[in-house]
Amino acid sequence: MSWLFGVNKGPKGEGAGPPPPLPPAQPGAEGGGDRGLGDRPAPKDKWSNFDPTGLERAAKAARELEHSRYAKEALNLAQMQEQTLQLEQQSKLKEYEAAVEQLKSEQIRAQAEERRKTLSEETRQHQARAQYQDKLARQRYEDQLKQQQLLNEENLRKQEESVQKQEAMRRATVEREMELRHKNEMLRVETEARARAKAERENADIIREQIRLKASEHRQTVLESIRTAGTLFGEGFRAFVTDRDKVTATVAGLTLLAVGVYSAKNATAVTGRFIEARLGKPSLVRETSRITVLEALRHPIQVSRRLLSRPQDVLEGVVLSPSLEARVRDIAIATRNTKKNRGLYRHILLYGPPGTGKTLFAKKLALHSGMDYAIMTGGDVAPMGREGVTAMHKLFDWANTSRRGLLLFMDEADAFLRKRATEEISKDLRATLNAFLYHMGQHSNKFMLVLASNLPEQFDCAINSRIDVMVHFDLPQQEERERLVRLHFDNCVLKPATEGKRRLKLAQFDYGRKCSEVARLTEGMSGREIAQLAVSWQATAYASKDGVLTEAMMDACVQDAVQQYRQKMRWLKAEGPGRGVEHPLSGVQGETLTSWSLATDPSYPCLAGPCTFRICSWMGTGLCPGPLSPRMSCGGGRPFCPPGHPLL
């Protein structure tokens, strides 16, 4: 009934309707009963200070509520409020109980954690104690081993001393025994010698008589043997001479035997030369694609693949300038059509700086034309001496036996085909050169000759007159260098990184940009030097711990290659023009010298100091339009352009 006192009012009470208003207080009603009693003081007890006004209002409100039409609803509202309070109290009680249970579980968990930590600490202490005990046991065991080792060493030392003493005693005994035996032997020999000498002195006459009798008997035996043999041979020869049939048969047999011996000797030599020309390989040939019987027996699968292979593109794997590509492609097409139509092959000269692809083009030309190729070097001819002429004839005889046609490639031809008038060459080398000129003087439908040289101006004039086509291989420019870098980067880095068992790894960076940058930094380098740079990338990756090729490693290899190239140029410059050594870029056309704008270029410095002369773009072409020779020098060994010449 708390609503009677004006407490616990909420939204539910408002929904049931407002309670009836309290009646207004009557004036003079408060304390009226007290005034009727007079001024007599009220008795003082525990209820003396109690104010019954609230009870009166409550009783009045209860009476009014009983007569009100909302009495039942108010009662229900009061009951519902009481139930709500009870439910709230019960929920709080449940929460208190849950909190108590949670507190108990936390206490149990804390106890378990403490117990676990205690067990862990006990375990750790046990392990530490066990380790300490094990350490003590190991130390005791090691001390025992050391003591045992010391004891064994002491015993071994004593045994060695004992053995040494016994060996010394035995050696002394043996020496004494040998000494006594030697004395006894000497005494015995001396006694026997004395006895033998005495016996010989006493029997000297008998011994001489025995020697005389033996010599007489031997002489009689030899004389009788000679007489008997002479008689037998004489009778046999007399019987042979008197019989004409035997004499005729003997003469015919000896004649046939001599004819057979000489015929077999000559036939064997002819057969050997035929087999060598057809099946063997001349000694001057270093490498050939021509199939021999021995090679077919050793590698039948590879030989069958080569026989079934189709002609390849002449420029596959070869990077050249566009103008040079067009020219060599025309040469390849002409050579292939010449083979198809069984025409006469032309002789070709490939000249230019080293490492520009001359040998590779010769191989590709042979494979593209369906011909066999054979590679020889000019430096192998001079050491042969007197055998050079025979070897040269064998080489061309072997070339004429090719059914598919043979491309004979001579690398470093300037080492052999030098000028006979000015160069000091031996008589044997001169004879070999004459034999070579004889075979080169006429065209053939069996072979074509391809010469490669870095110094073609040293050729004999007879060689120059026999050359049909001259092709100049130049150093690669920016575009060709970038193509070369990409080609060798793909062959030496990308393919090993994705194929094969022993793979190398490649870091992530812009490969195209890096190839372009390397092509820019390798200005002046040949194709061979760029290929060596790619191989150094691969070797650096294999030499690293993780096998990863990074951009920094590539940059280091490029810097090293550039430094090596500059060092080579310094060496080349130090040789000087009088030593017969030329700069790789000298004697070439103007488009190659575009990177040499000033003579102060550090790659080819002027010996006279600072120089401002420019290079003639017509140098080495023979087409200089100026009034002066383009071979003029600035005074420091640096050629410059005379007035009227086009400059680079």
Curated annotation (Swiss-Prot):
GO terms for molecular function: ATP binding; ATP hydrolysis activity. One of its GO terms (biological process) is mitochondrion organization. The keyword Transcription regulation does not apply. Residues 247-264 dip into the membrane without crossing it. It is a peripheral membrane protein. The modification N6-acetyllysine is found at K427, K495. It is found in: Mitochondrion inner membrane. Residues 32-48, 111-125 have a biased composition (Basic and acidic residues). GO terms for cellular component: ficolin-1-rich granule membrane; mitochondrial inner membrane; mitochondrion; plasma membrane; secretory granule membrane. The modification N-acetylserine is found at S2. Keywords: Acetylation, ATP-binding, Coiled coil, Membrane, Mitochondrion, Mitochondrion inner membrane, Nucleotide-binding. SUPFAM superfamilies: P-loop containing nucleoside triphosphate hydrolases. Pfam families: AAA, ATAD3_N. It comes from the Eukaryota. The keyword Cell membrane does not apply. Induction: Up-regulated by MYC. Gene3D superfamilies: P-loop containing nucleotide triphosphate hydrolases. ATP binds at G352, P353, P354, G355, T356, G357, K358, T359. Tends to be down-regulated in differentiated cells and re-expressed in pluripotent stem cells or cancer cells (at protein level). InterPro entries: AAA+_ATPase, ATAD3_N, ATPase_AAA_core, P-loop_NTPase. Forms heterooligomers with ATAD3A. Interacts with components of the mitochondrial ribosome, including MRPL11 and MRPS18B, and with other proteins involved in mitochondrial RNA metabolism, possibly via interaction with ATAD3A. Interacts with GADD45GIP1. Belongs to the AAA ATPase family. May play a role in a mitochondrial network organization typical for stem cells, characterized by reduced mitochondrial metabolism, low mtDNA copies and fragmentated mitochondrial network. May act by suppressing ATAD3A function, interfering with ATAD3A interaction with matrix nucleoid complexes. This is ATPase family AAA domain-containing protein 3B. The gene is ATAD3B.
